[in-house]
């Protein structure tokens, strides 16, 4: 299903998942650290983009650009559309693999600042171009700097170097320090964010400092966070609790408690990826997995998708065979439009609900209520969900079957005493199995990355008429070393109107990359257009 496609007589709506910000990744890793990090980083990037480029449905990422900073800054990839561009991204990842891993040179302190300024200038020119030519708007940019240097030192360097730079269009600024630690707890391999965050008011924006381990899984997980719907313009779900549900929460009987929540995916829908076991069954079905609670909750609307709790259930009273579809995670909202007191109260109530459900060993049965009535006079079918507590500040939401969906089934009771010989044989086989206390999906590989890469990769070579070869840069300590030519991602300059007073301020080293862009796909298809 594509953005804007309708599934009924109502108007099409674009979801917030379409509005993910463009991203600029700056790899700031000097020698000799690059030799240790290069392989893991390139593998993680290739795995990530094999997913991001091939996911059906609304685009999870809009634009992406890649810079490398060692002795100088270099634009490896100007801003390009991510979806459907795996071959181009794969070629640029190959560029990273080919960069020099040995030798010595002195890192230039201004190179990182120049990379940020050059990327910002590219983004401004690109957004100006697509706004006038394609009626698209890219209003803000997320910048991520992946560094092998001490993160706090890099933050201070950026604060000092960028204090005169206009960062008004930077939505988020991250510095991610790659550490040499080994992944100890793979099942919870999430980036660690430094919450101390020294004052970054010099720039008028905060710089988030995080650390990740130098291994493929940790880097993969960091990049996959880019696929989440990170919008905070409004809450996505209203969870409505009547006063009869929990007597320990005092509310008037005629005024149900409303918990404002954000919705987060737990995993990617397999039917949105080519080559998965069930991918061919529902990918084109307008009533398939893509029309889910997540999409309905993400619709930009004055009203919100509501989950009306109608009763409680014992945790032991739900058969897993009655749940279906993808699970989702509910969190207390972080919507910036709510005042601080309301956010705090909402989180406290959410915490109390999680605690009470765990203590009572209860689940909640809720009925989904769409944001508003459709144009049809027909009574819409309702969807019901079970809401399960956890030991974190989250709730798990799963769709549950109703009477209309049930098929007749018989389940004979299990006899108490199985046959002795059969019991011994089966127990002997079970004893030979390795027993794990928990299931860790990060330890189980389906070879999906390599499968997707083989589908969407193209033969190396001239992928685009504007691609051309360029002499490689020279390193001070490697002037006598024979280097091979590498393909660079360059295109014809976009027709731009120069901004008065800005041309003289552009660094000479970054001028070429600021003037070169990949055009959006619709412009590539029709080169005759102006």
Swiss-Prot record:
It is linked to Spermatogenic failure 48: An autosomal recessive infertility disorder caused by spermatogenesis defects resulting in non-obstructive azoospermia. Its main location: cytoplasm. Changing residue 430 to P: In SPGF48; uncertain significance. Keywords: Cytoplasm, Differentiation, Disease variant, Spermatogenesis. Required for meiosis I progression during spermatogenesis. Residues 503-516 have a biased composition (Low complexity). The keyword Cytoplasm applies. One of its GO terms (cellular component) is cytoplasm. Residues 463-530 are annotated as: Disordered. GO terms for biological process: cell differentiation; chromatin organization; female gamete generation; male meiosis chromosome separation; meiosis I; RNA processing; spermatogenesis. It comes from Homo sapiens (Human). Changing residue 317 to R: In SPGF48; uncertain significance. This is Meiosis 1 arrest protein. It comes from the Eukaryota. The gene is M1AP. It is found in: Cytoplasm. GO terms for molecular function: identical protein binding.
């Amino acid at each position: 299903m594509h953005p804007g496609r309708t599934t009924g007589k109502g108007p099409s709506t674009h979801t917030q998942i379409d509005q993910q910000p463009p991203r600029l990744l700056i790899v700031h890793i000097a020698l000799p650290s690059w030799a240790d990090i290069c392989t893991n980083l390139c593998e993680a990037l290739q795995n990530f983009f094999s997913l991001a480029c091939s996911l059906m449905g609304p685009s999870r990422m809009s634009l992406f650009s890649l810079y490398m900073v060692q002795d100088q800054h270099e634009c490896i990839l100007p801003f390009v559309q991510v979806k459907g561009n795996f071959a181009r991204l794969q070629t640029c990842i190959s560029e990273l693999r080919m960069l020099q891993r040995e030798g010595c040179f002195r890192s230039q302190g201004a190179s990182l600042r120049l990379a940020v300024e050059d990327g910002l200038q590219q983004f401004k020119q690109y957004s100006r171009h697509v706004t006038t030519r394609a009626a698209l708007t890219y209003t803000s940019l997320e910048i991520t700097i992946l560094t092998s240097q001490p993160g706090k030192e890099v933050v201070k360097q950026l604060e000092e170097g960028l204090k005169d730079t206009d960062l008004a269009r930077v939505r988020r600024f991250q510095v991610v320090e790659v550490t040499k630690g080994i992944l100890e707890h793979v099942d919870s391999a999430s980036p660690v964010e430094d919450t101390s965050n020294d004052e970054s008011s010099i720039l008028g924006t905060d710089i988030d400092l995080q650390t990740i381990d130098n291994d493929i899984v940790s880097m993969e997980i960091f990049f996959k966070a880019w696929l989440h719907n990170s919008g905070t313009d409004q809450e996505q779900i209203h969870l409505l609790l009547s006063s009869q549900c929990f007597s320990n929460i005092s509310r008037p009987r005629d005024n149900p408690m409303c918990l404002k929540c954000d919705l987060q995916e737990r995993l990617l829908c397999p039917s949105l990826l080519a080559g998965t076991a069930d991918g061919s069954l529902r990918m084109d079905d307008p009533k398939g997995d893509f029309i889910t609670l997540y999409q309905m909750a993400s619709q930009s609307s004055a009203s919100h998708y509501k989950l009306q709790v109608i009763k409680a259930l014992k945790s032991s009273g739900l058969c897993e065979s009655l749940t279906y579809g993808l699970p989702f995670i509910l969190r207390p909202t972080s919507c910036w439009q709510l005042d601080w007191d309301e956010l705090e109260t909402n989180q406290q109530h959410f915490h109390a609900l999680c605690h009470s459900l765990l203590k009572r060993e209860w689940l909640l049965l809720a009925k989904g209520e769409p944001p508003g009535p459709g144009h049809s006079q027909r009574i819409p079918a309702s969807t019901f969900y079970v809401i399960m507590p956890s030991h974190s500040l989250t709730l798990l939401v799963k769709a549950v079957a109703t009477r209309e969906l049930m098929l007749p089934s018989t389940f004979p009771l299990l006899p108490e005493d199985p046959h002795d010989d059969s019991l011994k044989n089966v127990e002997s086989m079970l004893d030979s199995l390795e027993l794990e206390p928990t299931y860790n999906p990060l330890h189980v590989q389906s070879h999906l990355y390599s499968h997707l890469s083989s589908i969407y990769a193209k033969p190396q070579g001239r992928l685009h008429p504007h691609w051309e070869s360029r002499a490689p840069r020279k390193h001070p300590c490697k002037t006598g070393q024979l280097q091979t030519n590498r393909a660079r991602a360059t295109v014809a300059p976009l027709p731009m109107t120069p901004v008065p007073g800005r041309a003289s301020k552009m660094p000479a080293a970054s001028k070429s990359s600021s003037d070169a862009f990949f055009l959006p796909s619709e412009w590539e298809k029709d080169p005759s257009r102006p």
